[in-house]
Amino acid sequence: MKKLKLHGFNNLTKSLSFCIYDICYAKTAEERDGYIAYIDELYNANRLTEILSETCSIIGANILNIARQDYEPQGASVTILVSEEPVDPKLIDKTEHPGPLPETVVAHLDKSHICVHTYPESHPEGGLCTFRADIEVSTCGVISPLKALNYLIHQLESDIVTIDYRVRGFTRDINGMKHFIDHEINSIQNFMSDGMKALYDMVDVNVYQENIFHTKMLLKEFDLKHYMFHTKPEDLTDSERQEITAALWKEMREIYYGRNMPAV
Protein backbone atom coordinates (compact mmCIF):
# COMPACT_ATOMS: atom_id res chain seq x y z
CA MET A 1 0.00 0.00 0.00
CA LYS A 2 1.33 3.45 -0.95
CA LYS A 3 2.32 5.59 2.02
CA LEU A 4 -0.14 8.40 2.69
CA LYS A 5 0.71 12.04 3.25
CA LEU A 6 -1.72 13.02 6.00
CA HIS A 7 -3.31 16.29 6.96
CA GLY A 8 -2.79 16.56 10.72
CA PHE A 9 -2.92 13.62 13.12
CA ASN A 10 -3.74 10.04 12.08
CA ASN A 11 -7.23 9.65 13.60
CA LEU A 12 -7.69 5.94 12.95
CA THR A 13 -8.38 3.73 15.96
CA LYS A 14 -6.99 0.20 15.71
CA SER A 15 -8.24 -2.32 18.27
CA LEU A 16 -6.91 -5.83 18.83
CA SER A 17 -8.79 -7.97 21.34
CA PHE A 18 -8.48 -11.62 22.12
CA CYS A 19 -9.40 -14.30 24.63
CA ILE A 20 -6.92 -17.00 25.55
CA TYR A 21 -7.93 -20.20 27.31
CA ASP A 22 -5.90 -22.72 29.30
CA ILE A 23 -7.66 -26.01 30.05
CA CYS A 24 -6.79 -28.42 32.86
CA TYR A 25 -8.12 -31.61 34.47
CA ALA A 26 -7.95 -31.77 38.27
CA LYS A 27 -9.17 -35.05 39.72
CA THR A 28 -10.09 -33.98 43.26
CA ALA A 29 -11.49 -30.87 44.91
CA GLU A 30 -8.07 -30.25 46.46
CA GLU A 31 -6.41 -30.44 43.04
CA ARG A 32 -8.98 -28.06 41.57
CA ASP A 33 -8.33 -25.56 44.34
CA GLY A 34 -4.61 -26.06 43.80
CA TYR A 35 -4.88 -25.37 40.06
CA ILE A 36 -6.90 -22.19 40.61
CA ALA A 37 -4.35 -20.98 43.18
CA TYR A 38 -1.46 -21.87 40.85
CA ILE A 39 -2.86 -20.15 37.76
CA ASP A 40 -3.98 -17.16 39.84
CA GLU A 41 -0.42 -16.69 41.09
CA LEU A 42 1.14 -17.36 37.68
CA TYR A 43 -0.92 -14.58 36.10
CA ASN A 44 -1.08 -12.14 38.98
CA ALA A 45 -1.21 -8.38 38.49
CA ASN A 46 2.55 -7.94 38.74
CA ARG A 47 3.35 -10.49 36.02
CA LEU A 48 0.59 -9.18 33.78
CA THR A 49 2.04 -5.70 34.23
CA GLU A 50 5.42 -6.95 33.05
CA ILE A 51 3.86 -8.57 29.97
CA LEU A 52 1.84 -5.47 29.09
CA SER A 53 4.77 -3.14 29.64
CA GLU A 54 6.82 -5.12 27.14
CA THR A 55 3.83 -4.98 24.79
CA CYS A 56 4.02 -1.18 24.94
CA SER A 57 7.68 -1.36 24.02
CA ILE A 58 6.92 -3.61 21.04
CA ILE A 59 4.21 -1.37 19.57
CA GLY A 60 6.24 1.78 20.24
CA ALA A 61 4.15 3.44 22.94
CA ASN A 62 4.98 5.47 26.04
CA ILE A 63 3.35 4.37 29.31
CA LEU A 64 1.53 7.24 31.02
CA ASN A 65 -0.18 5.38 33.85
CA ILE A 66 -0.64 1.85 35.18
CA ALA A 67 -3.61 0.63 37.24
CA ARG A 68 -3.51 -2.96 38.50
CA GLN A 69 -5.48 -5.06 40.94
CA ASP A 70 -5.54 -8.62 42.23
CA TYR A 71 -8.96 -9.88 43.33
CA GLU A 72 -10.29 -12.25 45.98
CA PRO A 73 -10.93 -15.12 45.69
CA GLN A 74 -9.12 -15.01 42.33
CA GLY A 75 -8.51 -13.00 39.19
CA ALA A 76 -6.53 -9.90 38.29
CA SER A 77 -6.76 -6.89 36.01
CA VAL A 78 -4.30 -4.38 34.63
CA THR A 79 -5.01 -1.25 32.60
CA ILE A 80 -2.33 0.87 30.99
CA LEU A 81 -2.77 4.26 29.36
CA VAL A 82 -0.24 4.98 26.66
CA SER A 83 0.79 7.68 24.25
CA GLU A 84 2.44 7.34 20.90
CA GLU A 85 6.19 7.78 20.92
CA PRO A 86 7.63 10.47 18.65
CA VAL A 87 8.15 8.58 15.42
CA ASP A 88 8.59 9.38 11.75
CA PRO A 89 5.52 7.86 9.99
CA LYS A 90 7.78 7.08 7.03
CA LEU A 91 9.64 4.60 9.24
CA ILE A 92 6.52 2.64 10.22
CA ASP A 93 6.39 -0.81 8.61
CA LYS A 94 2.82 -1.32 7.36
CA THR A 95 3.35 -4.64 5.63
CA GLU A 96 1.76 -7.88 6.79
CA HIS A 97 4.28 -9.95 8.73
CA PRO A 98 4.68 -11.47 12.21
CA GLY A 99 5.70 -9.34 15.15
CA PRO A 100 8.70 -10.11 17.35
CA LEU A 101 9.03 -12.69 20.10
CA PRO A 102 11.18 -10.81 22.62
CA GLU A 103 12.35 -12.42 25.82
CA THR A 104 10.70 -10.23 27.89
CA VAL A 105 3.88 -5.54 30.53
CA VAL A 106 -0.43 -3.15 31.49
CA ALA A 107 -0.67 0.80 31.45
CA HIS A 108 -2.81 4.03 30.75
CA LEU A 109 -2.58 5.97 27.45
CA ASP A 110 -3.76 9.44 26.48
CA LYS A 111 -5.74 8.12 23.52
CA SER A 112 -4.68 4.49 23.60
CA HIS A 113 -4.84 1.74 26.17
CA ILE A 114 -3.92 -1.84 26.94
CA CYS A 115 -5.92 -3.87 29.42
CA VAL A 116 -6.18 -7.45 30.60
CA HIS A 117 -8.61 -9.29 32.88
CA THR A 118 -8.24 -12.89 34.06
CA TYR A 119 -10.98 -15.39 34.87
CA PRO A 120 -9.98 -18.69 36.56
CA GLU A 121 -12.93 -21.12 36.65
CA SER A 122 -13.75 -24.67 37.72
CA HIS A 123 -16.77 -26.88 38.34
CA PRO A 124 -17.16 -29.43 41.14
CA GLU A 125 -18.33 -32.09 38.68
CA GLY A 126 -16.17 -33.48 35.91
CA GLY A 127 -12.81 -32.17 37.13
CA LEU A 128 -12.45 -29.59 34.35
CA CYS A 129 -10.83 -26.22 35.07
CA THR A 130 -10.37 -23.30 32.70
CA PHE A 131 -8.38 -20.10 32.80
CA ARG A 132 -9.38 -17.24 30.51
CA ALA A 133 -7.57 -13.98 29.91
CA ASP A 134 -9.23 -11.15 27.99
CA ILE A 135 -6.77 -8.71 26.45
CA GLU A 136 -7.40 -5.53 24.48
CA VAL A 137 -4.82 -3.34 22.80
CA SER A 138 -6.31 -0.17 21.33
CA THR A 139 -4.19 2.49 19.64
CA CYS A 140 -4.65 5.78 17.83
CA GLY A 141 -2.20 7.07 15.25
CA VAL A 142 0.30 5.15 13.19
CA ILE A 143 1.31 2.53 15.77
CA SER A 144 -0.32 -0.86 15.25
CA PRO A 145 -1.39 -3.31 17.99
CA LEU A 146 -0.83 -6.18 15.54
CA LYS A 147 2.88 -5.92 16.27
CA ALA A 148 2.19 -7.31 19.76
CA LEU A 149 0.12 -10.30 18.63
CA ASN A 150 2.94 -12.80 18.28
CA TYR A 151 4.46 -11.84 21.62
CA LEU A 152 1.22 -12.01 23.62
CA ILE A 153 0.18 -15.43 22.31
CA HIS A 154 3.69 -16.69 23.03
CA GLN A 155 3.73 -15.31 26.58
CA LEU A 156 0.24 -16.53 27.50
CA GLU A 157 0.62 -20.18 26.57
CA SER A 158 -2.81 -21.07 25.28
CA ASP A 159 -4.88 -24.05 24.19
CA ILE A 160 -7.50 -21.89 22.48
CA VAL A 161 -7.31 -18.30 21.21
CA THR A 162 -10.00 -16.10 19.67
CA ILE A 163 -8.80 -12.85 18.11
CA ASP A 164 -10.64 -9.80 16.78
CA TYR A 165 -9.08 -6.83 15.00
CA ARG A 166 -10.95 -3.78 13.76
CA VAL A 167 -10.14 -0.33 12.41
CA ARG A 168 -12.51 2.56 13.10
CA GLY A 169 -12.73 6.22 12.17
CA PHE A 170 -10.94 7.85 9.27
CA THR A 171 -7.99 10.09 8.55
CA ARG A 172 -7.48 12.57 5.73
CA ASP A 173 -4.64 12.93 3.30
CA ILE A 174 -3.26 16.32 2.26
CA ASN A 175 -5.87 16.50 -0.52
CA GLY A 176 -8.75 16.09 1.94
CA MET A 177 -9.66 12.55 0.89
CA LYS A 178 -10.79 10.26 3.73
CA HIS A 179 -8.97 6.97 4.36
CA PHE A 180 -10.66 4.34 6.54
CA ILE A 181 -7.61 2.09 6.88
CA ASP A 182 -3.92 2.88 6.41
CA HIS A 183 -2.32 -0.54 6.05
CA GLU A 184 -2.76 -3.77 4.13
CA ILE A 185 -4.41 -6.74 5.82
CA ASN A 186 -6.37 -9.73 4.56
CA SER A 187 -5.89 -12.02 7.57
CA ILE A 188 -4.72 -11.75 11.17
CA GLN A 189 -2.75 -14.93 10.47
CA ASN A 190 -0.32 -12.95 8.33
CA PHE A 191 0.98 -11.30 11.49
CA MET A 192 1.90 -14.62 13.11
CA SER A 193 5.18 -16.46 12.72
CA ASP A 194 5.30 -19.74 10.79
CA GLY A 195 6.21 -21.50 14.03
CA MET A 196 3.11 -20.14 15.74
CA LYS A 197 0.84 -21.10 12.84
CA ALA A 198 2.25 -24.63 12.80
CA LEU A 199 1.02 -25.19 16.37
CA TYR A 200 -2.65 -24.34 15.79
CA ASP A 201 -5.61 -25.16 13.59
CA MET A 202 -7.04 -21.79 12.56
CA VAL A 203 -10.22 -20.43 10.98
CA ASP A 204 -10.84 -16.89 9.71
CA VAL A 205 -14.14 -15.00 9.57
CA ASN A 206 -13.50 -11.59 8.01
CA VAL A 207 -15.76 -8.72 6.91
CA TYR A 208 -13.37 -6.82 4.69
CA GLN A 209 -15.72 -3.99 3.74
CA GLU A 210 -16.19 -3.19 7.44
CA ASN A 211 -12.51 -3.61 8.36
CA ILE A 212 -13.35 -6.44 10.78
CA PHE A 213 -11.06 -9.46 11.07
CA HIS A 214 -11.55 -12.56 13.23
CA THR A 215 -9.36 -15.63 13.75
CA LYS A 216 -9.92 -18.67 15.98
CA MET A 217 -7.05 -20.94 17.04
CA LEU A 218 -7.08 -24.46 18.51
CA LEU A 219 -3.90 -26.23 19.58
CA LYS A 220 -3.20 -29.13 17.21
CA GLU A 221 -1.31 -31.58 19.40
CA PHE A 222 -3.09 -33.19 22.34
CA ASP A 223 -0.82 -34.61 25.04
CA LEU A 224 -2.79 -35.74 28.09
CA LYS A 225 0.03 -35.08 30.54
CA HIS A 226 -0.03 -31.41 29.53
CA TYR A 227 -3.59 -31.14 30.86
CA MET A 228 -3.23 -33.08 34.12
CA PHE A 229 -2.66 -31.24 37.41
CA HIS A 230 -0.70 -33.25 39.99
CA THR A 231 -1.77 -36.53 38.37
CA LYS A 232 0.29 -38.59 35.95
CA PRO A 233 -1.51 -40.29 33.03
CA GLU A 234 0.43 -43.50 33.69
CA ASP A 235 -1.18 -43.69 37.14
CA LEU A 236 -4.62 -43.95 35.54
CA THR A 237 -6.35 -46.93 34.00
CA ASP A 238 -6.90 -47.06 30.24
CA SER A 239 -10.60 -46.35 30.69
CA GLU A 240 -9.86 -43.36 32.94
CA ARG A 241 -7.43 -41.93 30.39
CA GLN A 242 -9.97 -42.35 27.60
CA GLU A 243 -12.74 -40.76 29.68
CA ILE A 244 -10.60 -37.77 30.70
CA THR A 245 -9.30 -37.30 27.14
CA ALA A 246 -12.85 -37.28 25.78
CA ALA A 247 -13.99 -34.77 28.42
CA LEU A 248 -11.05 -32.44 27.77
CA TRP A 249 -11.41 -32.59 24.00
CA LYS A 250 -15.16 -31.93 24.23
CA GLU A 251 -14.51 -28.93 26.49
CA MET A 252 -11.94 -27.51 24.08
CA ARG A 253 -14.16 -27.94 21.03
CA GLU A 254 -17.11 -26.30 22.80
CA ILE A 255 -15.00 -23.27 23.69
CA TYR A 256 -13.48 -23.14 20.20
CA TYR A 257 -16.84 -23.32 18.40
CA GLY A 258 -18.70 -21.28 21.02
CA ARG A 259 -21.52 -23.77 21.52
CA ASN A 260 -22.41 -26.80 23.61
CA MET A 261 -21.96 -30.16 21.93
CA PRO A 262 -23.74 -33.44 22.58
CA ALA A 263 -21.85 -36.11 24.48
CA VAL A 264 -20.29 -38.73 22.20
Curated annotation (Swiss-Prot):
For the site labelled Cleavage (non-hydrolytic), the residues are K111, S112
Name what cofactor the protein needs: pyruvate
The metabolic or biological pathway listed in the UniProt record of this protein is: Amine and polyamine biosynthesis; S-adenosylmethioninamine biosynthesis; S-adenosylmethioninamine from S-adenosyl-L-methionine: step 1/1
A GO-annotated cellular component: cytosol
Give the EC number(s) listed in the UniProt record: 4.1.1.50
Query: Pfam families from the xrefs?
Result: AdoMet_dc
Active-site residues per Swiss-Prot or TrEMBL entry: S112 (schiff-base intermediate with substrate), H117 (proton acceptor), C140 (proton donor)
Q: Which residues carry this modification: Pyruvic acid (Ser)?
A: S112
**Which enzyme class?**
lyase
Q: Which reaction does it catalyse?
A: S-adenosyl-L-methionine + H(+) = S-adenosyl 3-(methylsulfanyl)propylamine + CO2
**What InterPro entries does the record tag this protein with?**
AdoMetDC_fam_prok, S-AdoMet_deCO2ase_bac, S-AdoMet_deCO2ase_core
Q: Which GO terms describe its biological process?
A: spermidine biosynthetic process
Keywords assigned by UniProt? Autocatalytic cleavage, Decarboxylase, Lyase, Polyamine biosynthesis, Pyruvate, S-adenosyl-L-methionine, Schiff base, Spermidine biosynthesis, Zymogen
Q: Name one GO molecular function term.
A: adenosylmethionine decarboxylase activity
PTM text: Is synthesized initially as an inactive proenzyme. Formation of the active enzyme involves a self-maturation process in which the active site pyruvoyl group is generated from an internal serine residue via an autocatalytic post-translational modification. Two non-identical subunits are generated from the proenzyme in this reaction, and the pyruvate is formed at the N-terminus of the alpha chain, which is derived from the carboxyl end of the proenzyme.
Q: How is the cofactor bound?
A: Binds 1 pyruvoyl group covalently per subunit.
Described purpose of this protein according to its UniProt entry:
Catalyzes the decarboxylation of S-adenosylmethionine to S-adenosylmethioninamine (dcAdoMet), the propylamine donor required for the synthesis of the polyamines spermine and spermidine from the diamine putrescine.
Subunit arrangement? Answer: Heterooctamer of four alpha and four beta chains arranged as a tetramer of alpha/beta heterodimers.
Q: Which family does it belong to?
A: Belongs to the prokaryotic AdoMetDC family. Type 2 subfamily.
- In its UniProt entry, what is this protein called? S-adenosylmethionine decarboxylase proenzyme
Organism (species): Shigella dysenteriae serotype 1 (strain Sd197)
